[in-house]
Amino acid sequence: MMRVPWNDMVYIKRALDIGVMGVVVPYVQNAAEAEAAVAACRFPTEGVRGVAPHAARCSGWGSRIAAYRAAMPQELLVACQIETEEAIDNIEEIAAVDGVDMLFLGPSDISASIGHMLDMKEP
């Protein structure tokens, strides 16, 4: 797994192209952002991930692209990082997005977003 710097299709593609089988996408606030993260992980027509199999380690430099593409929906893990009060308010909708496999809570960032920075005893 790799935590990408931002919910951006270029960062996600780079991580997947080097062969990681899971991404942690930071600062996901709502279902639309979770859907964008999942779409960045999927090839067309299920998503928007770019296709360059001969230039990517993940597909054996093109030699395993069919097998790789077939396995990705089942084997790739997509984790959305929940870090704000807004994300907490939308957590059920984020979790319900098809293709989101895991939610990762950032307790320090959540605490800061509700005005209790570094006070882990508060909600």
Question: Where do the language-model regions lie?
Answer:
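Expand to "…catalyze enediolate/carbanion chemistry for C-C bond making/breaking, isomerization
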Residues: M1-P123
